Amino acid sequence: MDYKSLKTLEYHKIIEKLSSYAGSEAARKMCADLKPMTDINSINDALTQTSDALSRIYAKGSVSFSGVTNIIDSIKRLEVGSTLNTHELLNISAVLTTAAAAKSHYEETNDSLTDYFNSLEPLTPLNTQIKNCIISEEEISDDASGTLRDIRRQMRISADRIHTELNKILNSPSTRSCLQDYVITMRQGRYCLPVKAEYKSQIAGMIHDQSATGSTIFIEPAAVVKLNNDIRELELKEQAEIERILAALSAEASAYTDELQSDYTILVTLDFIFAKAQLSKFYKCSCPIMNTDKYINI
């Protein structure tokens, strides 16, 4: 069909509406690229899939495909032994969660879409591992490993000791007049106290920063230097352990690159098919009976 005919039919508006029902970026692109077909077998196959998806929606409701984010680049990185970051691993988890939800939602249904759903591999053990270890893109769970839990426990103990020492200084009559404010603050990753510039020589310790006006000097009291050093050392150990955990999760995921690729491809395809079904539902469409005789009966 030529461009002029499509424009006259306002085909682009139909495509825009169709795209709005797709949950994933990849499926929205499939919607945007959709053009009228000419092969009757392909047309009938597509109509059957759309009708079956619509029947599933009426029978059990729809399933969300919004968790289907593009993991192709992550899969390629896994294939060459790279370590994925938290964002990439959470995307894989989201795809597997969607696969599990879709597979269970439409169990015991037999139609043209059955093979798609049966081919989904939720990889539950891998998904559970990722969820147990990664809370968000910025946070790894204490339960990700016993070593990480112990490191963070030691960090909390050291931080508590620092606060105890600094509170002694804050509450000491001999030093209160030297302080610009009665708070504990962080400068360059070190616990410090805000000291009036004219009294900086009265507080033994290391200067880490000063205010824009120069009236406040941020000093790390000598009493907490070792404890701050301990925390810094523990932070390095924490980061090393986090990197080890991410490497272990990536190694586990690398054993399932074929399944991950298949799941992603199937979910995008189903997202596209169910978007067409949702559009059909919105417009209360009926499935036409196609022919090759150029006969139209409306």
Predicted regions: what they are:
Residues M1-S62, V80-T83, D111-D115, Q129-I298:
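Alpha-helical coupling/stalk and coiled-coil linker elements that connect catalytic or binding modules
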Residues S66, K76-G81:
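N-terminal helix-rich structural modules
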Residues L84-A100:
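Short secondary-structure subsegments characteristic of cysteine-rich extracellular domains
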Residues S119-L123:
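The cytoplasmic-loop to transmembrane-helix boundary for the fourth helix
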Residues L126:
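Phosphate/adenylate-binding glycine loop and adjacent helical scaffold
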